[in-house]
């Protein structure tokens, strides 16, 4: 009978077997726990109409094209616009049940109420998307591994560290000397990235990269941008990685590792020598106070330490510089907002710039919040269900009934759409209005840094650094003008970065 399995019939046999496995998996997932969910009032959620409802590769390919074509934000908005009668719906995403939502209560459940039922390891660590860049770290681990990663970095994100403006000042002073003459058009985004690379390298490694003086030292920044851009693409298309050429991404990973390895190896060697001298009763120099040194004392394994450092240094180096660029993008297009910021800065006078002062500047903080709202660095909040759980909303035709979520399902809250929901923000939800934050209270409808125990540990540090830079720029320049007629188009990295840069001109 073996001759029957010829070159024509064999592919069909394989296809049939794969189809049977997928259908069996979906049947078992649907059948499991049905009576329990009915007892809790759960109803099935609306489902996205797909041309490929069995395998679910259509939406994966569509998303991959959007990412590579720099239309990801538009793709997300169009996806939700296609389901106008509900804030929550599901799709078959490469064989997984993927639940999309813009419901704040679902974000609350994932981050707080049902935190123990959700995690990130199944989507960030087990698929090969992020490897060989990094494996375990604070943003890829759950349970004890996550607790350990958090312990590694927590001392450096305490209040005594993030409130310091003295740490920022010398780098901001240098940055100001590099800005061009009045009226000259320039792209401020690369300069912001060099500025932040210098701050971050001193904070993490104890020694600044000094890329504002030596521009060639910023090359690792562009490699990190490629690592983040490719990492997102690989994580979201991990089931069809074979369909794309990733040579450019592996080259970027190699460059980043090549940058970090000397720091890590020299630190481990210095630590070993110090411990030996202490053991021998010999005098030692004063202990280093940078983050890498602190991490190395708790994790002296080179490969594991590099993974942890990668997942702090690379995303952290991108986030703040992009965010300040977004702030300036909007301010250059809203002269009244710049004037109001200038008025608030002028009212302070010559008082020293402190964390408390910046936190109390209402309009400045309105600018930060409004920028987070319109261009959130964290576009989606994605979690995998680690166990069966019932969410308070999302079921039924309008999404108002409880929703049964099974182990292995993916829940994705689309913040870039939720933050523009007219039901929450009013008819001007798409408009830039920093004043809307005057008197507005926070809540689960707006969490730029996440919430609950897993919120971003660098939240206050990012806010302080961003506010400080905007304060200094408003203090120096009377006018900011947009010199790029292009609308904002996002190139996705850790978050959306302006594809056309941030081309502006300043006037004193």
UniProtKB/Swiss-Prot annotation:
Cofactor(s) listed: heme
SUPFAM superfamilies, alphabetized: Cytochrome P450
Key words, A-Z: Iron, Membrane, Metal-binding, Monooxygenase, Oxidoreductase, Transmembrane, Transmembrane helix
Pathway as given in its UniProt record: Secondary metabolite biosynthesis
Induction: Expression is positively regulated by the cluster-specific transcription factor tenR and is induced during cocultures with the natural competitor fungus Metarhizium robertsii.
Keyword Isomerase on entry: no
Xref: InterPro entries: Cyt_P450, Cyt_P450_E_CYP52_ascomycetes, Cyt_P450_E_CYP52_fungi, Cyt_P450_sf
Segments crossing the lipid bilayer: 8-24
Gene Ontology cellular-component annotations: membrane
Positions contributing to heme binding: 456
Outcome of gene disruption: Fails to produce tenellin, and leads to the accumulation of 11-hydropretellenin A, 12-hydropretellenin A, 13-hydropretellenin A, 14-hydropretellenin A, 12-oxopretellenin A and prototellinin D.
Gene3D superfamilies: Cytochrome P450
Membrane topology field: Single-pass membrane protein
Similarity comment: Belongs to the cytochrome P450 family.
Cited function: Cytochrome P450 monooxygenase; part of the gene cluster that mediates the biosynthesis of tenellin-type 2-pyridones, iron-chelating compounds involved in iron stress tolerance, competition with the natural competitor fungus Metarhizium robertsii and insect hosts infection. TenA catalyzes an oxidative ring expansion of pretenellin A and 14-hydropretellenin A to form the 2-pyridone core, leading to the production of pretenellin B and pyridovericin, respectively.
Name under which the protein is recorded: Cytochrome P450 monooxygenase tenA
Gene: tenA
